[in-house]
From Swiss-Prot:
Role description: Required for disulfide bond formation in some proteins.
Cellular-component GO terms for this entry: plasma membrane
Disulphide bridges: C37-C40, C99-C104
Keyword list, A-Z: Cell membrane, Chaperone, Disulfide bond, Electron transport, Membrane, Oxidoreductase, Redox-active center, Transmembrane, Transmembrane helix, Transport
Family recorded in the similarity comment: Belongs to the DsbB family. BdbC subfamily.
UniProt organism field: Bacillus anthracis
Gene: bdbC1
This protein's name: Probable disulfide formation protein C 1
Example of a GO biological process term: protein folding
Record InterPro entries: DiS_bond_form_DsbB/BdbC, Disulphide_bond_form_BdbC, DsbB-like_sf
Gene3D superfamilies per UniProt: DsbB-like
Amino acid sequence: MGREKKQEYALFTAWGASFIATLGSLYFSEIMKFEPCVLCWYQRIFMYPFVLWLGIAVVKKDYRIASYSLPIASIGACISLYHYVIQKVAAFSAAGAACGRVPCTGEYINWFGFVTIPFLALIGFITIAVCSFIVIKNK
């Protein structure tokens, strides 16, 4: 497979991850009526613009977006990881109890004993970061 095709597929995959993450986030808050905590809002702030930015980049085949999306996705992943640690590690849970009206330690979902909303966001951010790295590597 040629370099440009790899870039194209990686960029589309990154956009797809951001689109699915945004739809999932909106589903949980608007349909299921789960109120987001403060850290969830920060994760949304980092995730939602990717749908537009990466969507435009896919249409225009503008692979330069990867140099911006990689650091932004990495910051979002750090926020998600911190949120996940607050939920799952007892020693850190005291930090999340007073982060706003809704405690950051709350787990609206807990699939298979480890999949929570911050974990899903973390997977989305990691997917975007890895795809951005692939785009940069194949320039």
